[in-house]
Curated annotation (Swiss-Prot):
It comes from Rhodospirillum centenum (strain ATCC 51521 / SW). One of its GO terms (biological process) is cell division. NCBIfam families: minE, PRK00296.1. Belongs to the MinE family. The lineage of its organism: Bacteria, Pseudomonadati, Pseudomonadota, Alphaproteobacteria, Rhodospirillales. Disulfide bonds: none annotated. This is Cell division topological specificity factor. Keywords: Cell cycle, Cell division.
Length: 97
């Protein structure tokens, strides 16, 4: 190997290095998805959407995240009120747009 070959050797492109680093960061963020602030925020948003269409109590919604062998499962249990006789089957509130 002569001196010029030393300076000409192929370096890994910076784009490849950046891509590898980004993949590592994303993998760490995905691993932290079951953090304590994730589920309460998700439950709050789901509750707001459900309340647009059905009058329910806050304590009637349960959100649970389970992880098994590389697979994540989100379980949402909503206890809906009994239907009232003669009530129209339309959303409780509609957005005017």
């Amino acid at each position: 190997m002569n001196l010029m070959d030393f300076f000409r050797r192929n370096k890994e492109p910076t784009a490849t290095t950046a891509k590898d680093r980004l993949q590592i960061v994303l993998a760490h963020e995905r691993a932290d998805r079951n953090a304590p602030d994730f589920l309460p925020a998700l439950q709050k948003e789901l509750l707001a959407v459900i309340k647009k269409y059905v009058p329910i109590d806050d304590d009637k919604v349960a959100v649970k995240l389970e992880r098994e062998s590389g697979c994540s499962m989100l379980e949402v249990n909503v206890e809906l009120p009994a239907p009232t006789k003669g009530a129209p089957r339309q959303p409780a509130a509609t957005a005017a747009g």
